Curated annotation (Swiss-Prot):
It comes from the Eukaryota. Keywords: Nucleus, Repeat, Ribosome biogenesis, rRNA processing, WD repeat. This is Ribosome biogenesis protein YTM1. Pfam families: NLE, WD40. It is found in: Nucleus, Nucleolus; Nucleus, Nucleoplasm. GO terms for biological process: chromosome organization; maturation of 5.8S rRNA from tricistronic rRNA transcript (SSU-rRNA, 5.8S rRNA, LSU-rRNA); maturation of LSU-rRNA from tricistronic rRNA transcript (SSU-rRNA, 5.8S rRNA, LSU-rRNA); protein-RNA complex remodeling. Component of the NOP7 complex, which is required for maturation of the 25S and 5.8S ribosomal RNAs and formation of the 60S ribosome. PROSITE patterns: WD_REPEATS_2, WD_REPEATS_REGION.
């Protein structure tokens, strides 16, 4: 049978942790014409045979449902027939292939969408398993969605689409929002400000955080009376230092630090605790200017007149064009990364506050994401593609171009990236082409493309967030928070 050119010798292997999905790694011959579906049938048949043997021995008699699988050869997802793979890689049917199988990625279907009053620029989520919760003193039951909007308002949505809280203080478009803890959030916007907010979560207050503020209130800091009952959406502090719009944020709960991306060419470095930062005098507002401002701006200016101000721990200067994205290294909190319209990715030592590596690409970079388990940095560009970089490979000089892989599929700017919470090889991207795409770094094309509920791609998508409980959350010009989810989408 091994001489039959229509057959090839293979063996299956898997890294699935579920023991019930593992088959014996015994060599067998299969037709070279098989694709994913045919191979999936074979694996399920082998699993069913094993199940039958276990049932005869009295070990397990529970009925097993077929499981769809994806297949990898030499780390590459099989998207064609085995024959096409052999031809493309210059192999013959005499080869002996080891084929890895994993749970298939099923199409993410539309679940819900929530109406907002203006364009949605940024999204974040919180659930019981995220570090924003596990690093706090609170336990939570229900996941929430945080949104930032072009009307300057930050909102918290529950899973029914109800707006539970509003955070009003920004005088221009909000560009990024992040959870710090269940009772703390941070936002930034075109008004050049970073704002720390406090609130209750499902009626519960983090007593540790409240005790800190009580102690400071007793010391007479800023003359604020923080002994009062907590209010939804109260600005805890305004963080000032940027001289242009602030468009992205990153939070590290371990070190209690924040990074911000500014159009003033700076990367801001802040603390989640305002007591760690130097005070700034509260400005005296010109009554003549205030009186001629819009009603909204006048009200916000008067409110801000009593709010404490803080300066950054540091402003990291090195980019030559506006900074678009910032992240902390998930494996080393003393390292940060930033991307800019100057085409570069910079690596920052957050202890010495110095840039330690610069790598140059060919296009403006608009978003950044780390995939720590596979040692890659993904960047979205103005050239419509996504680049994958290995941060361990140092650029030989400041002008060198280091790109590992280029993922092509979007037809406009790639402005948002979010990692899969389950699969270290997967992430999602949002684009001005009106779509969200799901990617696996082992495939050269996107796995799925998500449009809006009505199938439209006319509205730009700005924000994307992939939550383990909620699913894929996206928002943009259509003023809707949309949720898509597929069974085992990334398992």
């Amino acid at each position: 049978m091994s001489d039959d050119k229509n057959q090839i010798k293979i063996k299956f292997t898997t890294n699935e942790s579920d023991e019930s999905l593992k088959v014996e790694e015994t060599p067998l011959y299969v037709p070279v014409t098989l694709k994913r579906y045919g191979l999936s049938e074979i694996v399920n048949h082998l699993l069913e045979t094993q199940k039958a043997l276990e049932s005869e021995s009295g070990e397990d008699d529970e009925e097993r449902k077929p499981v769809p699988f994806n297949f990898l050869i030499n780390g590459e997802l099989l998207r064609t027939s085995i024959s096409d793979y052999l031809t493309r890689n210059g192999l013959s049917s005499e080869a002996f292939l080891t084929i890895e199988y994993t749970r298939a990625i099923l199409p993410p279907s539309f679940q819900a969408s929530f109406q907002n009053d203006d364009w949605i620029s940024s999204l974040d989520s919180i659930n019981r398993n995220l570090s924003a919760v596990t690093s706090s003193q609170l336990t939570i039951t229900n996941p929430k969605i945080l949104s930032g909007s072009y009307d300057g308002i930050v909102k918290t949505y529950n899973m029914s689409g109800k707006v539970e809280k509003q955070y009003m203080g920004h005088s221009a478009a909000v560009k990024s929002v992040k959870w710090i803890s269940p009772t703390r959030i941070v936002s930034c916007g075109n008004d050049q400000q970073v704002r720390l907010w406090k609130t209750a979560y499902e009626g519960v207050v983090d007593q540790n955080e409240e005790d800190e503020e009580e102690n400071e209130a007793n010391e007479g800091d800023d003359g604020d009376n923080d002994m009062e009952k907590i209010e939804d959406g109260k600005t805890l502090a305004i963080l000032e230092g940027h001289k242009a719009p602030v468009v992205d944020l990153a939070v590290n709960q371990q070190t209690k630090r924040i990074l911000s991306a500014g159009y003033d060419l700076n990367v801001g470095f802040w603390s989640t605790n305002y007591k760690d930062m130097a005070k700034i005098s509260i400005p005296e507002y010109d009554s003549n200017v205030i009186s001629t401002s819009s009603k909204k701006r006048r009200k916000l200016a008067l409110q801000d007149a009593t709010i404490r101000r803080r300066s950054p721990l540091s402003l990291l200067l090195g980019h030559t064009e506006p900074v678009e994205g910032v992240i902390f290294d998930e494996l080393d909190a003393t390292v940060g990364y930033s991307v800019s319209q100057d085409h570069t990715i910079k690596t920052w030592d957050l202890v010495t506050l110095r840039c330690v590596d610069t790598r140059t690409t060919g296009f403006s970079l608009l978003s950044i994401l780390q995939l720590p388990q596979v040692n890659l940095i993904a960047t979205g560009s103005s050239a419509r593609h996504i680049n994958l970089h290995d941060p361990r490979v140092s650029a030989s000089n400041t002008n060198s171009e280091v790109v590992n892989t280029k993922l092509v599929g979007h037809t406009n700017f790639v402005v948002g990236l979010s990692a899969s919470p389950h699969n270290s090889n997967m992430f999602a991207s949002s684009s001005h082409d009106g779509t969200v795409k799901v990617w696996d770094i082992r495939a050269d094309k996107s796995l799925y493309t998500i449009t809006r509920e009505d199938g439209s791609t006319k509205s730009k998508i700005f924000g994307v967030c992939w939550d383990s409980e909620i699913g894929l959350i996206s928002g943009g010009e259509d003023k809707r928070v949309q949720i898509n989810k597929g069974s085992d989408i990334s398992k």
